[in-house]
């Protein structure tokens, strides 16, 4: 199925690209989320008419993500207290939701889907650097300090 992308999508293309994707991916993800439209003659004309508006929106989103990245870089280490054993092993773990909530409490809005933990949840006390992907082109690093509750 051929679609026109209305947003930059990682590993697929940029705004305005006409790409061939599997029908299920288009029907179940791209079309319902408004990230693409079916590539037919009428949609191509509508897209060309709205192209400047969509590019401006994309640029505004990128600028907002850059501002959030600067705020995150300015943050000091975010402290998360969790119950832990004697050797620093946590009872449970610190996941993406916990990190997102702690950063939001520190003053920078962050969704749990933006937090990247490639090695899984944090299961020990200590200091960690967690990558946050705010936009397809903007990444930031948050310093997270996991401490044992007293």
Curated annotation (Swiss-Prot):
Q: Does the keyword field hold RNA-binding?
A: yes
One GO CC term of this entry? ribonucleoprotein complex
Alphabetic keyword roster: Ribonucleoprotein, Ribosomal protein, RNA-binding, rRNA-binding
**Cross-referenced Gene3D superfamilies:** Ribosomal protein L9, C-terminal domain, Ribosomal protein L9, N-terminal domain
According to the UniProt record, which cysteines are disulfide-bonded? Answer: none
Q: Which GO terms describe its molecular function?
A: rRNA binding; structural constituent of ribosome
Q: What GO biological process terms are annotated to this protein in UniProt? A: translation
Signal sequence, renumbered to the chain:
none
Instruction: Report the protein's function.
Output: Binds to the 23S rRNA.
Supply the name of the protein: Large ribosomal subunit protein bL9
Q: Which organism is it from?
A: Shewanella sp. (strain ANA-3)
């Amino acid at each position: 199925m051929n679609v026109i992308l209305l947003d930059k999508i990682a590993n697929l293309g940029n705004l305005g690209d006409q790409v061939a994707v599997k029908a299920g991916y288009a029907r179940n993800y791209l079309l319902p989320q408004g990230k693409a439209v079916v590539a037919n003659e009428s949609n191509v004309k509508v897209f060309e008419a709205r192209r400047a508006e969509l590019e401006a929106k994309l640029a505004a989103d990128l600028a907002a993500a850059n501002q959030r990245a600067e705020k995150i870089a300015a943050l000091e280490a975010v402290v998360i207290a969790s119950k832990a054993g004697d050797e620093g092993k946590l009872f449970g773990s610190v996941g993406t939701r916990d990190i997102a909530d702690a950063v939001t409490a520190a003053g920078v809005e962050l969704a749990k889907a933006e937090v990247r933990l490639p090695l899984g949840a944090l299961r020990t006390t200590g200091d960690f650097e967690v990558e946050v992907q705010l936009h397809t082109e903007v990444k930031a690093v948050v310093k997270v300090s996991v401490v044992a509750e007293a």
